[in-house]
Amino acid sequence: LPDAKILHGDHIRDDVGSTLVVGHDLWTVRNADVVIVNGEEKVGAGTAQEILMAKYFQKPVVCVMPKETHHRKSNLSFNGLLIEDWIHPFLDVSSDYIAPSLEDAVAWVKDYEAGKITTPIKGISVFEKAIEQFESRFPEMVKRYTKP
């Protein structure tokens, strides 16, 4: 990506105060064309919030997450059900593309910029849709969670 500019949080430090740190980081998200997340290691609280806000700002989120990393495991078993390619649910739902490598992420961004990506970019409503699916699939659990 010859015209890409990488923006990161190292230009501002916590000693300026929490509001300015958050303001800086969210400014970079709001003004980005695409948000690329390093999901190779455990994602921190700030990164998780930035991903959420990227959806609020309708930004494409590409998460670089090779197999067998903290948030992506092969052949995981939950309650006796084998999941061949488990991806952390919050990262899976909020990402527009899970890239197995940085090279794959760059290729996706090039395709996106060229108009070759036809899947709509997820917005903040992706979370409301997840809640609706939960309520529809597990009405008895919703009843148990709801006050009488």
Per-region residue spans from a language model:
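Conserved catalytic or regulatory cores that recognize and/or transform ribose-phosphate-containing ligands
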Residues: 1-148
